[in-house]
Swiss-Prot record:
This is Large ribosomal subunit protein uL29. The lineage of its organism: Bacteria, Pseudomonadati, Campylobacterota, Epsilonproteobacteria, Campylobacterales. Keywords: Ribonucleoprotein, Ribosomal protein. One of its GO terms (cellular component) is ribonucleoprotein complex. InterPro entries: Ribosomal_uL29 (IPR001854), Ribosomal_uL29_CS (IPR018254), Ribosomal_uL29_sf (IPR036049).
């Protein structure tokens, strides 16, 4: 997900996306602990997506 895709969304859409990504990050961390995660790089990608969404939210303020 790129910042250009995110910046045109409304605050409500961004909040929903942020919540979904945080839930996804939580489940990925659980899978990592139980050795079920096949690609650990997914965690860093989701964390970067969360940072991009937070940047877009702060830009709206």
């Amino acid at each position: 997900m790129k910042y250009t895709e995110i910046k045109d969304k409304t605050a409500g859409e961004l909040a929903t996306m942020l919540k979904e990504k945080k839930v996804l990050l939580f489940t990925l961390r659980q899978k990592l602990k139980t050795m079920q995660l096949t690609n650990p790089k997914e965690i860093s990608e989701v964390k970067k997506d969360i940072a991009r969404i937070n940047t877009a939210i702060s830009a709206l303020k």
